[in-house]
Amino acid sequence: MKKILMTVAFAALAIAGANAQTKFGVRAGLNHTDQAVKEYDIKQETVPRISFYVGGLAEYAFNDVVLMDAGLTYSNQGYKTKIGDGKVIDHTLNLPIWFKYDFAGFRPKAGLYAGYVLNHELKGNTSSSYSIKDEDYNHFDYGIGLGAEYNLPNNGLFFEASYNWGLANLRKNGDSKNYTNNRVIQVGVGYKF
């Protein structure tokens, strides 16, 4: 699955770059981030946390209405533990690829992402049975996303919202009884030059 996602991403970038109008830009906003966690076949209760994302993008217009954007985004992800005041924090670099259709500035979008977790850590106090070790986690993440953006007319400013659903099991040696998957809602603003 990883190879397929990367092949699609690079092929899309190559095709778009060959014959397209390109704009570059920046984006930033808030994350409402959580993870689906299961340990020993028991679903763990987690609490979403608010964090942020920031990054750059390149938007390719295939024609007047079909567009694609790709970029590199730092995203602070994770969740709060249900017991104690602990937070699981993932410092992640994501490469999102969005395909969009323009309706007079409103652009529904669907896409995929590949990510690399730079660091996975637990902060704060939790129950004594709860532990996280960075070496127990995969650093490669991937998933799919849905969203929309609105571009102001005759202006580079845009507003966006998206939901990213992680498909990768972030646990090393994970299975259907032991897994961790990302779930991230993003709301932000950006500017295209």
Where are the regions a protein language model picked out?
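Residues that define the transmembrane beta-barrel architecture of outer-membrane proteins
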Residues: 22, 46-52, 89-93, 104, ...
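Helix-adjacent hinge/juxtasegments
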Residues: 81-110
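Outer-membrane beta-barrel translocator domains and adjoining extracellular loop/strand segments
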Residues: 36-43, 80-86, 120-128, 171-176
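Short glycine/proline- and aromatic-enriched beta-strand/turn motifs that initiate or cap beta-hairpins
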Residues: 20-59, 68
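Predominantly the C-terminal beta-signal and adjacent terminal strand-loop region
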Residues: 77-81, 133-136, 144-147, 152-193
